[in-house]
Amino acid sequence: MYKRQVEYGGELRCVQVDADGIHEVEIHNDVFKAPEIQEEQTVTTSSVADVIISLRGNRYIQEKTFGNISSFNFTSKAFNDRVWDEQTTKARGLYIDTFKGRVAARAYDKFFNINERPETKFDMLQNKLQFPVTAYVKENGFLGLVSYDEYNDDLLIASKSTIEGPFAGWLKDMIYEKVTPENIENMKRFAKDNNVTFVFECVDMKHDPHIIEYPESNLYLLDIVYNQINYAKYDYDAMCDTAHRFGLTPKKKACELATWQEFYDWYYDILEDDYEYNGRVIEGFVIEDSTGYMTKIKLAYYNFWKFMRTISHEAIRNGYIKKTSALTTPLANEYYAWVRKLHDTEDPANVPRDICTLRRWFYNDMKQAEGDSLI
């Protein structure tokens, strides 16, 4: 006897043996109970109230409260232990009005570097990416969010995790410096009417220089994202049109790649040590395929000087580093020999720690040394 979900209206199948031989018999069940379908409970299909409960119950997610609004972000332990699931990837620059049960502002779901995760291994991308794919220049600053604050009829300006603190303050200062009062008012009205967040890369060379040096501080509008749990955003052309209306600088589309072969060739070209985009060094690229799937690439110049920043901090503090075997290139060894001497200055505590300044000093000293050698 074989049951084919007979309890849910299927058939009971059996074998009957009689004088005429062996026969298969199926008896259909017309009296049955409907199956109880277990729906997958995820943050993308739940109500906002359910999401709040779910996020608060996750030990890898940190909540910060600002009156009725809370920010939810993955913890450093989640990052270090690579605890990535639908909740921890969602909790990145996510602001929820927990009193009204609505999203107040939001950034991207977390996405990963090529080769950082099993699903982003380069060889896996051939089957993962849906072509054409678009590459956008990845500027090197900190993430900033601008939405509508209905409680104060003002802009809600936030960093990735807080509406207080220095980063939110620097972002606010930058907005009021770069955007006219009229356009600030227009942005506020636009964010309110369309229930969206302006997502920025804030390059602040005065307060927070990163790895790539810029001639001046600037704001780059990355995307306009809907204030909802399910991630959705304006398309690139609509985002650019809106940016230009408000006097903002949109992110730069670098290229569109129609096939895997085009992507493959481009990928290995940009990984060259001396690669520059339109004559300048950049952090990397964000890749977005035709379905919205995103991954990113960090380039050689950025990776090298990010590593040398760590070397610098240890060398200035101690006068040496423990693992000199990590210095695998002539440039790395030359820079290390230079930067460790800063430990012996009269006041090493006041030596700049940002790599942009240190790198500039290093090259200036190298140029001067070359000039002296010619005399």
Language-model regions, residue ranges each:
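Feature recognizes metal-dependent phosphohydrolase scaffolds
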Residues: 1-42
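Core nucleotide-handling region used for phosphoryl-transfer chemistry
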Residues: 39-375
